[in-house]
Regions:
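N-terminal amphipathic/basic-hydrophobic helices that include classical n-h-c signal peptides
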Residues: 1-26
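Basic, polyanion-binding surface patches
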Residues: 23-194
């Protein structure tokens, strides 16, 4: 008979019983004021990366992103995320009023790599990345995240070549004219892992 044991991930305690079953005790989140996040947002997004997710129980997709911003707009905390129309996540961003920004711990960099290199059109990215979706009234976030921001879409606009003051950016990043769409999401709820 196998011995019982346990292991701890960044978001859950897994208890293996003597009969081969596994019980999962999820760690909880606490609601926080988004203005209390003291981390450098340039590092949080540009180096640590974020997982942008939109959808619901009926279907969702997420993508790894390292371009964006977390700041203050219209007197409210807000995220600025950029999604190309060619991305599967774009369909969900367009058809939903909310999206989430998930910040995973460094120990889950593998999940970010998977979500940034595979398409949800071709596979179940959450399963492939070992991520556990949690559903709210407005969308989806992941149990493995250390920070979650649930954002209500307030503004969106396609980027255009003519709007760039620095034309070298168009040459460098948009030679194929595959411009991003910018979404400004007002943070309606922020959660931190306990």
């Amino acid at each position: 008979m196998p011995a019982a044991g346990f292991r701890l991930s960044s978001r859950a305690l897994f208890v293996d019983n003597a009969f081969g079953g596994v019980k999962i005790f999820r760690m909880k989140f606490e609601k926080i004021d988004p203005k209390s996040v003291a981390e450098n947002s340039a590092k949080l997004i540009g180096s640590d990366w974020m997982l942008v997710c939109a959808g619901d129980r009926g279907g969702f997709n997420m993508m790894t992103a390292s371009w964006g911003a977390f700041g203050f707009m219209w007197n409210m905390p807000a995220f600025f995320v950029f999604v190309r129309p060619s991305r599967y996540t774009y369909e969900f961003m367009e058809s939903r009023d909310f999206f989430t920004v998930n910040i995973l711990p460094e120990s889950r960099r593998d999940a970010l790599n998977i979500c940034g290199s595979r398409s949800g059109r071709d596979c179940d990215k959450a399963a492939a990345a070992g991520l556990t979706p949690e559903f709210t009234e407005n969308g989806v976030y992941f149990a493995e995240a250390r920070l979650v921001f649930e954002c209500r879409k307030a503004y969106s606009q396609m980027m255009e070549a003519g709007s760039f003051a620095d034309k070298t950016l168009v040459e460098k990043w948009y030679a194929a004219s595959d411009f991003h769409k910018m979404y400004v999401g007002v943070v309606e709820r922020a959660l931190a892992a306990k």
